[in-house]
């Protein structure tokens, strides 16, 4: 007998005065509904700094701050560096950016351009832009790339509601990587930040994402934390139950000159570095790495892999990559089961499409990639199989006490996507060559 679908989970923010201190505040996430009795997923902040997530149950009549505060203190007592990348970040911190937000001074974030690629989603885009326009970063421009539009809705929104506060760029060739390259070409910032039209950015997001560039001239990329804005449907809960987009709360530093010994597949485990909804590049480093591969990404036959390709390209060019949980965006996961099926297939396709792109565009990496490829594919296959077969565990994001098993059908879709990825990439390259030959 199948288990009943999960009930909606409230999503809130809980701020503590210290790891074992009292609760300073408890509030819904930006744009979210009020907390109600039942399951609650909480981002735990310590003096404003994202530090953990907890999943608990608040019964009628209970004080939610008391219940969640106790869970948070227990969770924080168990945190600390566990991987080589986390240990490297701990011994090479970014000065004052590792302090709580209210204590930071002295590091001025560089001039930054935020690029948001979008296609026919004006309501979501407006929500994202509203959050970007209240960032505490003092020197920023926002560039919207309207990718292969069918209507004028995006153009009308940007020009009428936002005027000269947001720049509008039209890119008629479909594909997320193409759109990102168009935005990068139009942007004026020393740092290029990228996010999606289905996020709400924390007010400190851009400062936290870009301050590290001011302290480390060898830094080519910074990625940040992505948490769910809503957990209202079974598909949203299932995705977050198995990791979602979050990469944890410990800072991590990846240095090609000091590859992590506990990641033998480095740098080809690009999925562990971050996600495209929350990433920034030093503009010069991204240009040196050749930009995004236009045959990758949503909107192409490759289905994905544009962000993963860029991470590896920048690392392969000799630049460092840093992950910081202080750069936070809230992501609106897709609502439906079919969305989740499409996402699972796209993940698999994007993984092998980006590996194929790396081989094609950086042939000098061929020996290293071939050495690691069998183990990497076996690891990916084992991970998808394990998700489908694990009977119990912690969720969402591995921080709770309830489990919603990952259906084997989704694991099979991921593996089918992995088989398709190289074919999709080849198709996308052929289509790009055809457009170029036709003068488009």
Roles of regions detected by a PLM:
Residues 204-247:
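Conserved donor NDP-sugar-binding/catalytic core segment of glycosyltransferases
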Residues 346, 363-440:
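Non-catalytic, C-terminal membrane-associated alpha-helical segments of glycosyltransferases
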Residues 242-271:
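Short, flexible, basic/aromatic active-site loop/helix in glycosyltransferases
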Residues 2-5, 9, 14-21, 29-37, ...:
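N-proximal low-complexity "stem/linker" segments adjacent to membrane-targeting elements
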Residues 154, 171-187:
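Glycine-rich, basic loop-to-helix element that forms the pyrophosphate-binding segment
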Residues 274-277, 298-310:
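Acidic donor-binding loop at a coil-to-helix junction in glycosyltransferase catalytic cores
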Residues 192:
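Short aromatic/hydrophobic "clamp" motif used to bind/position activated sugar donors
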Residues 130-170:
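Acidic donor-binding segment of Leloir-type glycosyltransferases
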